[in-house]
Amino acid sequence: MFKMVSSPHTHSGKLTAHIMLWVILAMMPAFFTQIYYFGFGVVLQSALAIGTAIIAEFIAIKLRGKKPLNYLSDFSVALTALILAMAIPPYAPYWIIIIGTLCAVLLGKQVYGGLGQNPFNPAMIGYVILLISFPLQMTTWMPPINLLQEPPTFSDTFSLIFSGLTTDGFTLSQLTHNIDGITQATPLDSAKIFYKSHNQLSDFYELIKLPIFMGNGTDFAQGWWQINVAFLAGGIFLILKRIIHWQIPVAMLVTFFCLATATAFTGFTHLSAISQLVSGAMMFGAFFIATDPVTASITPRGKIIFGALVGLFVYLIRYHGNYPDGVAFAILLSNICVPLIDHYTRPRVSGYPTKGRK
């Protein structure tokens, strides 16, 4: 006896859980690179985020009258939590990541019905809520630990996150007292602050003398470009594994690079276009966030348009907005446009003539 089931009758064999695990695996080079340059904070933030996400998802699914284990086993909520944990400052207070994770899971995902129903990237919903609500905590970054006289140990990190003090009673700002105060911001923050009072091209050489930059005549920032390269390597791995498509990251990066390069010829002072590509969350966003299959465009041409739109928004925010990075806002703004993009880029159905032809 044959059993009738709905289409599709053949599929790639890639289960949701397998895809999520591949993405998590591809993030590991950047995860360990972040530990190397910024300490153990990301480990504790990830543990808090994943634990909070699992509990929140369990309760939400239970309240909807469904079996939580059937949904938790796809690892999607763990990936959301890990993305958020790697996006916030590693030494942010513990309540920051808990609030952000709850917002990501409940407001960014479950309120729409769960996995596959959300129109916006859940991790970016949580991140943007935190950035708007707690700007001080979300913009206070520890400089690379190799610049510190006494890098925080694991116990210091635990104490900083949960009490705001190290085991010896020092605050985060006191740990960096021997470094220029601007280094508690990211390189993009530092550049935006610097160029508000320095608008000459010659002032570029004053900027790159700051401790967070390499000190070899370039504007590549210590720790940040290495993390971005690690995300790039992980992203290429996902493309080769056919977990993600190349159109979105390539369109995003090329669009931003072209606009940033063109702007440089107008005399507008900022970090170089190459440095911008390996600063902030550029590679993270291009390969691991913008490519979310639920919230991104699904058509071949739509992916290119969507990626280019993200790149355009990142450029506008970084160069002309108040926020130094802009990747999270750019992705959410582009998510809004996805239904329209997909509507106008639908492939022609086989056997049907194109519009205007008989």
Curated annotation (Swiss-Prot):
Belongs to the NqrB/RnfD family. Its main location: membrane. Keywords: Cell inner membrane, Cell membrane, Electron transport, Flavoprotein, FMN, Membrane, Phosphoprotein, Translocase, Transmembrane, Transmembrane helix, Transport. The gene is rnfD. Pfam families: NQR2_RnfD_RnfE. It is an enzyme of class 7 (translocase). The chain crosses the membrane at residues 19-39, 41-61, 79-99, 125-145, 220-240, 248-268, 271-291, 297-317, 321-341. The keyword Cell membrane applies. Its cofactor is FMN. Coiled coil: none annotated. It comes from Haemophilus influenzae (strain 86-028NP). It comes from the Bacteria. PANTHER family: ELECTRON TRANSPORT COMPLEX PROTEIN RNFD, ION-TRANSLOCATING OXIDOREDUCTASE COMPLEX SUBUNIT D. Part of a membrane-bound complex that couples electron transfer with translocation of ions across the membrane. The modification FMN phosphoryl threonine is found at residue 186. GO terms for biological process: electron transport chain; transmembrane transport. HAMAP family: RsxD_RnfD. It is a multi-pass membrane protein. One of its GO terms (cellular component) is plasma membrane. InterPro entries: NqrB/RnfD, RnfD_bac. Its EC number is 7.-.-.-. This is Ion-translocating oxidoreductase complex subunit D. The complex is composed of six subunits: RnfA, RnfB, RnfC, RnfD, RnfE and RnfG. It is found in: Cell inner membrane.
